Structure formats: structure tokens, C-alpha cells
UniProtKB/Swiss-Prot annotation:
It catalyses: urea + 2 H2O + H(+) = hydrogencarbonate + 2 NH4(+). PROSITE patterns: UREASE_1 (PS01120), UREASE_2 (PS00145), UREASE_3 (PS51368). It is found in: Cytoplasm. This is Urease subunit alpha. It comes from Rhodopseudomonas palustris (strain BisB18). Ni(2+) 2 binds at K219, H248, H274. GO terms for cellular component: cytoplasm. Its EC number is 3.5.1.5. CDD domains: Urease_alpha. The active site is at H322.
């Protein structure tokens, strides 16, 4: 016997279903459920008097016979490929299925089997996303990693050796010895980690040495001299080893202008960091490269989004990060040349057009690594408020805009850096790196962070309390962050050459190495999901005004942002 219930009652019980709409945090962004994989009247839910009990929603199937290790029930998945309601099965640390969970002995349409060996995470009324991937990390201190994890970031790629002056300014780990020590330290951290070697060299030998020693990418940084010769050499070596190259080009235009840098690319694929230019790069027109078919452009979050405070905070930030002296006129001029309100405003719009493909932090080196996700959605909200709905969206929802923006910190950096087969989206066969959110706290404070199928971090109340929720509630590492579980649930990104050389055994590390792949000619701007636009971008050298296909890109700075102070009162 079936009974009809109001949508509101159903949503309270099982979460939203097809056609229901959900607001993301306190933004103006509204998503609508496109499809519900569960079956009305056959939903599974855990708890006293609920469905997932022996002989009801729980079968007798063993894990060896195919029952899931964990099922996240009735979750609202938000990913680049869709916004859908489903049960999600995790098995052996990977995403095993997305569909309808239950007991196939008594329930129809079951594609995920719940057995006695299955644990349940209640996803009713929650949003499930892939773990974030921050591909612009200055590894200045190890404490960064926990802060990033608690924000919903489960993978980090960058460079450094700790609080050295080279690391303060540049995202690269120079030389085999430093690479080895850093990779050995990665056994302590429950996230996926990768290192970029220093790419600034005009001859290949030193770069090859670093790739074989475990670098999964090479970084060209102007503070080490990003000359056309270094660019060409670095890309040539990267092509030979199938690793990505990231570039921070020549702000001072000493060794050439943006046209010379583009010429040195020779059409080869490259990841352009902080493409707007406030983080560094040819002044004032590095932003032009965002329109090239071979450039994978990203932003760092200090300029995201453009607000009334953005310009003021940047100058001091830049002086500290790049070891500049405010008493030296040339240093001050260098800093001031990088901070331009016109290009920062254009950056907002280029993100909304899908011309800027990725978001990252620039951790402690002008960026805040715990705010990659927050600032992505603040940018999306600002653009909706200022530009209205995208042409691809209906009046009812912002689904396409949401898919465009979530791709910027999940699947697109994974594609750019050759790890999309492992991470970056909620798809069958990928590592179960997942984040569960309450809609009201979406993008700001996660409910649960899952790493390699295990709960790695969560907000937790007083451990001495009689229930888990009494204050004070703090984000804490969970069991997957300790012991050998840590090694089993995360990997180190390296080159395939390092894997073939047996680097893990040489360094005596416990984590598995994952060799990056398909980072060169196999990908281009067209590979950037929902963010593959290649407009012709022009910058006026006198006024710094930016035009895309002839249209002036300008917008007002935000006076107030969502996902901000009201979430951090305590």
C-alpha cells in the first residue's frame, strides 16, 4: 500500500527529489535536482524503526559476494556531470556505484547491495561533492595540510621545502635531495600530495633529474628567471616525461613581453598560474593567455572575487611574499605594477564566461589555502548578482553555473595534472575522496570529509560528552588520519619515471605512488570541462581595460559577500 505525502515532508525525510530546489549557503545560487536514482517507497534510511535492518533494507549478502563497504544514502550529488539524488556505494576505498541501494531479495531496482558488512552515512538533506584539488601550494608549513583538509580539499600539488625564502615566493621543490625529504614527510598526512620541481633551467639535465626523483610537474617562476630559453627547455623535458608545466611569467618584461612567452610555448600545453596577473606575470597583459587553445589558465584566490578591499590588501601581501623592500623605489614599482583593478574585475567575468578554467590558493604566498572553495562560490554568487543568469540556465535554477564553478577546483585541475583517472569527480572507479555538506553551510563548513573511502575529518563535540554534539565543536582528524590507515587512503603524485625507478622503495615510504599521465599533447583548453572558452583577449596598455572578443570586461567591486562573517562568529 502506498501513500502520497507532501514534497516538504518527503524532503525532510529523504532529502530533495527531482524538481526540488536548494539554495547554496547564503548565496543567490539555486540548484535543482535533475534526476533521482532512488525509488519512491523503496528508499533506504538508517536508524531506529527505519529501513536498513536485517531482512528489510539489509540483505544477507557478504562483502565478498558484493555488498558495499559503505553506502551514503539519499545524497544530493553536485558534480560537473550532473546534480542528482542517489545512493553512493564505496568499496575498497573507491566509488563502486551510484544508484539505488537496498536488499535485492525484497526490493526492486537495487543496484547497490547493503549487507551485514555495510556501514551507512546518512546523506538525507545533504550535498555530496568530490574533494577539492588545490594545485597551487607553497609548502611553507605542514600545518597547512590540516587546514586545507578541514575546508574540503583532499588533494594538494605544489612545491617548497618549508619556510625557506625560495618557498615563500615560488612553488617548486628544487633538486632530488629536497624532493626526497619532502616525499618522505608525506607519509604523515592523510591527503593526496604532489610536488613540482624547479623548471627554470636552460639545459635539460637538472630537470630530468628532478622528475626522476619524484616531481610530478615542473614550475617556471619569474623569481628564478622565466626566460624564453627556460620556458622552451622546460616544456621540452616535460613532453619527454609526460608531466605538466606551470608558469609564473616575467612581470618586469625583462626577458621579453607576453608575446615572447607565448612564442616560447610553441603551441605546447601549459598551466598558467594566477592568469590575471596580480599574483605575477607580464604586466599588464598576461591575462591574454586565457584565450589561447594550449593554455590551461587558473586563478589564485586573493583576487577572488573583486571586492572593495582587494586592492588595499595586495600591496603589503606582495612585498612580504616576494622579499621586496618598500624603501627601494624599484621594488615598490614592481609591486604596484602587478595590482590593477581593471584586470582583477575582468578576471571575475572571465571565470563566469568559462575562459578561466581553474581555481587555487597560492597558500601563504598571497593566498589562503582554506578558502579555495569559499572564494570560488563567492565569485559565482557575485557574477549572478551582477550579470544575471547564464544563457545555459533557466529561470528556475543555476545548475550550469554551479557545474562550471565546481569543475574549477575538482575535475579541471585533475585533468590538467594527469590524475583525473583517480580523482576529481564522483564517478564509478575513482578514489572515494568525498565531502558531505549541509546546504546552509555549503562551501564553508563541511559535515564530513571522506578520504579513500574512510572518514578522515569531521566537526566533533566534546569527546567526554554523552553524545557527539555538545560544544565546543571543533574540526578534528578522524581514524583514517592515523596509523597505517593513512597510508592506505591517500597517494603521492609523481612522474611515471619515478614509479618505474622504484622511488617508493628507495625512499622507504609507505604511501603508494601514482604516476601522472596525459598531461601534454593529449589535453588542451578544450579539455577543461565547462571552462573551455577561448575568446580573443586584449588589454589596453594605458588604461589596463580588458576586452574579450571586443566586449569591455568590467564590473563593480563587491561591497559585501556571502559565505563570510555570519559563518565565522564562533
Amino acid at each position: 500500500m502506498s501513500v502520497k505525502i507532501p514534497r516538504s515532508v518527503y524532503a525532510d525525510m529523504f532529502g530533495p527529489t527531482t524538481g526540488d530546489r536548494v539554495r547554496l549557503a547564503d548565496t543567490d545560487l539555486i540548484i535543482e535536482v535533475e534526476k533521482d536514482f532512488t525509488i519512491y517507497g523503496e528508499e533506504v534510511k538508517f536508524g531506529g524503526g527505519k529501513v536498513i535492518r536485517d531482512g528489510m533494507g539489509q540483505s544477507q549478502v557478504t562483502n565478498a559476494q558484493g555488498a558495499a563497504d559503505t553506502v551514503i544514502t539519499n545524497a544530493l550529488i553536485v558534480d560537473h556531470w550532473g546534480i542528482v539524488k542517489a545512493d553512493v556505494a564505496l568499496k575498497d576505498g573507491y566509488i563502486a556505484a551510484i544508484g539505488k541501494a537496498g536488499n535485492p531479495d525484497i526490493q526492486p531496482g537495487v543496484t547497490i547491495i547493503i549487507g551485514p558488512g555495510t556501514d551507512i552515512i546518512a546523506g538525507e538533506g545533504k550535498i555530496l561533492t568530490a574533494g577539492g584539488f588545490d594545485s597551487h601550494i607553497h609548502f611553507i608549513c605542514p600545518q597547512q595540510i590540516e587546514h586545507a583538509l578541514m575546508s574540503g580539499v583532499t588533494s594538494m600539488l605544489g612545491g617548497g621545502t618549508g619556510p625557506s625564502h625560495g618557498t615563500f615566493a615560488t612553488t617548486c621543490t628544487p633538486g632530488p635531495w629536497h624532493l626526497g625529504r619532502m616525499i618522505q614527510s608525506f607519509d604523515a598526512f592523510p591527503v593526496n600530495l604532489g610536488l613540482a620541481g624547479k623548471g627554470n633551467a636552460s639545459q635539460p639535465a637538472a630537470l630530468k633529474e628532478m622528475i626522476e626523483a619524484g616531481a610530478c610537474a615542473l614550475k617556471l617562476h619569474e623569481d628564478w628567471g622565466t626566460t624564453p630559453a627556460a620556458i622552451d627547455n622546460c616544456l621540452t623535458v616535460a613532453d619527454d616525461y609526460d608531466v605538466q608545466v606551470m608558469i609564473h611569467s616575467d612581470t618586469l618584461n625583462e626577458s621579453g613581453f607576453v608575446e615572447d612567452t607565448i612564442k616560447a610555448f610553441k603551441g605546447r600545453t601549459i598551466h598558467a598560474f594566477h592568469t590575471e596577473g596580480a599574483g605575477g606575470g607580464h604586466a599588464p597583459d598576461i591575462i591574454k593567455v586565457a584565450g589561447l587553445p594550449n593554455v590551461l589558465p587558473s586563478s589564485t584566490n586573493p583576487t577572488r572575487p573583486f571586492t572593495k578591499n582587494t586592492i588595499d590588501e595586495h600591496l603589503d601581501m606582495l612585498m612580504v611574499c616576494h622579499h621586496l623592500d618598500p624603501s627601494i623605489a624599484e621594488d615598490l614599482a614592481f609591486a604596484e605594477s602587478r595590482i590593477r583593478k581593471e584586470t582583477i574585475a575582468a578576471e571575475d567575468i572571465l571565470h563566469d564566461l568559462g575562459a578561466l578554467s581553474m581555481m587555487s590558493s597560492d597558500s601563504q604566498a598571497m593566498g589562503r589555502l582554506g578558502e579555495v572553495i569559499i572564494r570560488t562560490w563567492q565569485t559565482a554568487d557575485k557574477m549572478k548578482k551582477q550579470r544575471g543568469s547564464l544563457p545555459q540556465d533557466s529561470a528556475r535554477n543555476d545548475n550550469f553555473r554551479v557545474k562550471r564553478y565546481i569543475a574549477k577546483y575538482t575535475i579541471n585541475p585533475a585533468i590538467a595534472h594527469g590524475v583525473a583517472r583517480l580523482i576529481g569527480s564522483i564517478e564509478q572507479g575513482k578514489l572515494a575522496d568525498l565531502v558531505l555538506w549541509s546546504p546552509a553551510f555549503f562551501g564553508v563548513k563541511p559535515d564530513l570529509i571522506i578520504k579513500g573511502g574512510s572518514i578522515v575529518a569531521a566537526p566533533m563535540g566534546d569527546p567526554n560528552a554523552s553524545i557527539p554534539t555538545p560544544q565546543p565543536v571543533h574540526y578534528q582528524p578522524m581514524f583514517a588520519a592515523y596509523g597505517r590507515s593513512l597510508f592506505a587512503s591517500s597517494v603521492v603524485f609523481t612522474s611515471q619515471a619515478a614509479v618505474a625507478e622504484g622511488l617508493a622503495k628507495k625512499l622507504g615510504i609507505q604511501k603508494s605512488l601514482y604516476g601522472v599521465e596525459n598531461t601534454r599533447s593529449g589535453i588542451s583548453k578544450k579539455s577543461m570541462i565547462h571552462n573551455d572558452a577561448t575568446p580573443n583577449i586584449e588589454v589596453d596598455p594605458e588604461t589596463y581595460e580588458v576586452r574579450a572578443d571586443g566586449e569591455l570586461l568590467t564590473c563593480a567591486p563587491a561591497e559585501v559577500l556571502p559565505m563570510a562573517q555570519r559563518y565565522f562568529m564562533y
